[in-house]
Amino acid sequence: MKMSKQSMRRNLLWLSVLAGLTIPSMQAFDLSLHAQADSVQEDVHPMDTSRFLPWSLTMWGQHRSNTMDHQLGQLLVRGGNIDRTLVDAARAAQGGDMGVFGFSSGFQLHARSRRMWKETNWRLCGSIQARWIGDSRWTPELYDLVLTGNAEHLGRWDVLDGTRARSTAWLNAAIGIEGQHHNRVELGLVYRPFQFEGLIHTGYFYVNEAVDDLHASMRANARMSRKAGWGLGVNAEWHFLREEAPFAFHVQLRNLGVVLAPNPLRFAVDTVLETSGLPLSGAGWSIASLQDEGFAEGLYTADSSGVDFQLLPGRLDLSFEYPLSPRTGWDVQVQLGEWMPLPRAISGFRRAFGKHWQAGVQVIAGGWGRVRPAAWARWRMPNERAFMIYIEDPWGWGSDSAYGRGVTLRYESL
């Protein structure tokens, strides 16, 4: 089934508006910020005396690549003259590995009731979160074909396997129960306005040195939502905190769920093209037939029947904290999922300064980028409020040659 021009314009307009609203903050590092502070807080449980429920608000944005620096990525997104040195530098950084780029941005509001449920150790809790994430990967050969051409590839096979691009956004409103140590489980209603994804399963491209023989083959598929989808998602946390144990352990499961997508537009390509030359005109393949309207429609199939069940890009976080002294500690965290090509590993040192300030430094590896530093600071206000800022790759904020930027802000009532 073909998509009408009017429908395609609406989809493009929607994506443009959403990108314009979110790209300035672009991807994110939504880690368990409250967990980093637990091990060095005093053993007291202050009560919020305001009329509002205990709550926290977290906002984040981050983008990261292992090959493209901020300057080249900005030119590719916004347009402009691209200097060849930027292209060559990104190609040298990629080497023979897959190039990757990812982003994540959004916010999460979490609240819980003051009183326990009917004289139990459980209380009601809930959250509202909005997220937008994206993931793209490409082979070195595809990078060359797109940005520099195939002049240096004549006589060799270019491999495109594993190249992909995908993006999605969703809103999750959840309600659940929370027990001791903030252990909780929530079930949420998910609204997903859009998702698109494309993947080249196998792809090859070859032109001989005499430039008179071409071979191209591709098996790929793509899918784009035409209507908003609805589904269910589960969030859960478990925190091991014991006075007799010299350490703390945290497990967080986020956005484990499924979405029902009605009538998505699906494309499939399974084509092999071989030629040793094309006539100007005539029956079959010719230069004239390549220019005819609708020629490309014979290379793929499309349909939009039925519904699809699609998994949300959930994430699992495992955190370990070990106090080195009453005011210092060592943290280790591993994050899995959320379309990251590699697990993200984090290790850091934290210290408390007086009763109201904490700060820490970290080293991050994996995810969408190479090894990079991070730093955070937390201010516990006298009125039982706290504010925290987390910056990934802080030196990258002042340099166009950085491979990404990220910031997370959190405000909470204690």
Feature annotation, model-predicted:
Residues 114-120, 180-182, 241-245, 323-327, ...:
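Outer-membrane beta-barrel channels and translocator barrels
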Residues 327-339, 345-369, 373-377, 385-397:
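Transmembrane beta-strand segments that form the barrel wall of outer-membrane beta-barrel proteins
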